[in-house]
Amino acid sequence: GFLTAEEKGLVNGLWGKVNVDEVGGEALGRLLVVYPWTQRFFQSFGDLSSADAIMGNSKVKAHGKKVLNSFSDGLKNIDDLKGAFAKLSELHCDKLHVDPENFRLLGNVLVCVLAHHFGHEFNPQVQAAFQKVVAGVANALAHKYH
């Protein structure tokens, strides 16, 4: 696998403490605020007119929860991310035509949210391990493009 045993331990140790539903909504919300062009995929979600509207939007929260639960499932298959995300890759790439760069942006936003939630515990070693994971997931999701 692309993660060492130690890195897997760091990732799983922190992930066990993550409130997946809450963090998912926050990460997707921040993506839409920080990178406004990503909003075009979410036009059916209602009010995205301001940061407050986005962060409070129940559809954004619900989809964020879904996204992070999928990410969570992916962590259980960390040595076969391409397999774990094959169906989602097909949906997002073939059917929704999402630019794979957006998966990378969301991964980086997720890292920011985790740093914000966990403070000192999200030390450089933990961050390095998570950056590898989000890059791996983004690559797996972009797999259909290659």
From Swiss-Prot:
Sites of N6-acetyllysine modification: K59, K82, K144
Superkingdom of source: Eukaryota
Gene3D superfamilies: Globins
Gene Ontology terms, MF aspect: haptoglobin binding; heme binding; hemoglobin alpha binding; metal ion binding; organic acid binding; oxygen binding; oxygen carrier activity; peroxidase activity
A Pfam family annotated for this UniProt entry: Globin
Residue positions where Phosphoserine is found in the record: S44
Gene Ontology annotations for the cellular component aspect, listed alphabetically: blood microparticle; haptoglobin-hemoglobin complex; hemoglobin complex
Any Gene Ontology biological process: hydrogen peroxide catabolic process
Sequence positions bearing S-nitrosocysteine: C93
Residues noted as binding heme b in the record, renumbered to the chain: H63, H92
CDD domains registered for this protein in UniProt: Hb-beta-like
PANTHER family (alphabetical): HEMOGLOBIN FAMILY MEMBER, HEMOGLOBIN SUBUNIT BETA
Subunit structure: Heterotetramer of two alpha chains and two beta chains.
Function: Involved in oxygen transport from the lung to the various peripheral tissues.
Family (UniProt): Belongs to the globin family.
Protein name: Hemoglobin subunit beta
Species in which this protein is naturally found: Lynx lynx
